Amino acid sequence: MFLGLIPIPTPISLGIQNGSVEDCFPFKRSNLIRYQIKNMNKTICNNSPPIISPFTSIIHFTLLFTTSNSPSQSFFDTIEKNESRKGIYMKLISWNIDSLNAALTSDSARAQLSQAVLQTLVGLDADIIAIQETKLSANGPTKKHLKVLDELFPHYETTWRSSIEPARKGYAGTMFLYKENLSPKITFPEIGAPSTMDAEGRIITLEFEKFFVTQVYTPNAGDGLKRLEERQIWDKKYADYLTALDIEKPVLATGDYNVAHNEIDLAHPSSNRRSPGFTDEERSGFTNLLNRGFTDTFRYIHGDIPNVYSWWAQRSKTSKINNSGWRIDYWLTSNRIADKVTKSEMIDSGTRQDHTPIVLEIEL
């Protein structure tokens, strides 16, 4: 079939599964408009609506060809050539769960809200899920925890890091769930942080062939800012750590950073100038981190959109109803791959207060 002779819209089918195709038709003389397909999140720039086949690995869409702009090489040869150089599409989620044990084993009203959020995450089918504030014992998840996780997320591997002595027991802690087809090298870095911070299970890093995925649960400055000086040291050490990773290969960094970077990132900036998470010192620390070569992907995608937050205080029963929130959870990337991000946003967690999950979609 010589498609260049067809002057009317012609349906073409491509088999695409868990991947991305971008600029598959780079004909210099063609009037084809650039398009992207992102793992079933489709943007067809010629406004031809995609039709989802009953076979989900196939997407039908319409392309326009004219005689004057016919390609000089085989249409399907071009597809094959460009398919061979497409990137790696990934969906990643991060969530401060505020007690994994409660979310997995309790039947309290709050636990039921957490379980509903977990079901939402199940449906999103992420490649990697980062979890902060697991609050597990030094021995990590129990057999019961692992059983429930396996029921929720079959075909995922689990790695975790708990708070250990001399740090407090059942405090902080992080965990990754990642699909079993992935084979990262896992490290549990210590960054030379003050006090017991390095023993509190705050960082896990996954190393892949071409990039790092790392998560953090940044220490809170504490009531009365009693930990603010230590927090400032932490911020510098953490920035040094991410920079060292970035020298090797691009970085995707996520977690609860316990800081609202700018006034737009919380509902009531004027009354929180000396509140933990919005002090000048903490904000400056985050600015320094970004200045070391990292991008806040939410702002990169959404610009200065206001009133979008990732955390609402549990102490106030109306904080979420009134949207009196803070944006303190982030997906960061190395600057040089920020343009690969296609989505960075919050995931709806219903009426549950505290943190809501955040999602990143990227083609590396």
Question: What are the residue ranges of the model-derived segments?
Answer:
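N-terminal, active-site-proximal structural segment of metallo-dependent hydrolase catalytic domains
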Residues: 36, 75-150, 160, 166-171
